Design a protein with these regions (language model features):
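Glycine-rich phosphate- or other oxyanion-binding loops that anchor nucleotides, phosphorylated ligands
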Residues: 28-196
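A short, charged/proline- and glycine-enriched loop
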Residues: 1-3, 38
Length: 196
């Protein structure tokens, strides 16, 4: 069983991590997009609540153990008043537009990545009218956490988000997600190392 479980929604979020840790496609799990080595396992869920619900429970049932740590890595939209495009943030508080739950993650002094709140939304936000979202938004983290909490203590769930936009993108085809993750790979790996 693997101790480090990395979750991404998009293949472009996963690829720099796959390369960094020298992960290979797990042939034993052809029904899921899983990449692994003897120390790390990475699942690409797909975008949105339904995709996470369809993949993550199956995956965790197969690989979870009591020493597991789950790290969700991905892009997020950010409020221009509180975030900068390309910056990585450690999520300290998580809410959603569809669950009535709020998760407050335990912090340790060792985490030097800036901390911020995240709201999981149902659909892409391309206009933050009335400044509703004050920090970050994504489409998976609350669903991932809601499922993972059935297996892991909240202290064993970590979320890292890299700001890809200021909630103003209409055409996602020009966004270089791979580069955003790649430019933050050292911060990602340092958080994973802290939990070894």
């Amino acid at each position: 069983m693997v101790d480090k479980i990395i979750i991404t929604a998009l293949q472009d979020e996963a690829n720099p991590i796959i390369e960094f840790y020298n992960l290979t496609r797990d042939a034993k799990q052809p029904d899921l997009k899983v990449y692994a080595n003897n120390k790390y396992n990475l699942l690409v869920t797909g975008v949105g609540r339904k995709k996470v619900i369809d993949t993550l429970p199956i995956y965790l049932n197969r690989i979870y153990n009591s020493n597991s740590i789950l790290i969700n890595v991905g892009i997020a939209g950010g409020n221009p008043s509180s975030t900068k495009i390309g910056n990585i943030y450690y999520i300290e508080k998580l809410t959603s537009d569809f669950f009535k739950k709020e998760y407050v993650f335990p912090l340790t002094d060792n985490i030097i990545i800036p901390k911020i709140g995240l709201t999981t939304v149902e659909k892409n936000i391309n206009k933050n009218n009335n400044n509703i979202y004050k920090e970050l938004v994504d489409m998976e983290a609350a669903v991932i956490t809601d499922i993972a909490i059935k297996y892991l203590d909240l202290s064993k769930i970590k979320i890292l988000k890299i700001v890809s936009d200021h909630m103003n993108i209409m055409d996602w085809s020009n966004l270089n997600i791979r580069k955003l993750i790649q430019s933050n790979i050292e911060s990602i790996s340092s958080l994973i190392k802290l939990n070894e």
